[in-house]
Amino acid sequence: MIDKVKSPLLTEKSIRLLQKNQYTFQVNSDVNKTEFKKWIEIFFKVKVMSINSCRPPRKKKRIGLISGYTVRYKKIIVTLKSGDSIPLFSI
């Protein structure tokens, strides 16, 4: 499962969500909510309250005469029980 998690997302919005005890990850498109919830609870030993996921739209990119699209990915936002935290995101 660890190979399906690409990276933690640290954007302006995700940093604001850290104050609400919500953590954002970029994962492969084939990951579903239930297996990701089990993985987070086992790996980080925290209690997950809810999980939201979305697949942002592709953006059109152009380099010279060649045009294409960015790679699709899935973003998962994990809400933890108050008092729990993931040390990976400690700023």
Swiss-Prot record:
Keywords: Chloroplast, Plastid, Ribonucleoprotein, Ribosomal protein, RNA-binding, rRNA-binding. GO terms for cellular component: chloroplast; ribonucleoprotein complex; ribosome. The keyword Cell inner membrane does not apply. It is found in: Plastid, Chloroplast. GO terms for biological process: translation. The keyword Plastid applies. Its main location: plastid. GO terms for molecular function: rRNA binding; structural constituent of ribosome. Belongs to the universal ribosomal protein uL23 family. NCBIfam families: PRK05738.2-4. Binds to 23S rRNA. Part of the 50S ribosomal subunit. PANTHER family: 60S RIBOSOMAL PROTEIN L23A. This is Large ribosomal subunit protein uL23c. It comes from Chaetosphaeridium globosum. The lineage of its organism: Eukaryota, Viridiplantae, Streptophyta, Coleochaetophyceae, Coleochaetales.
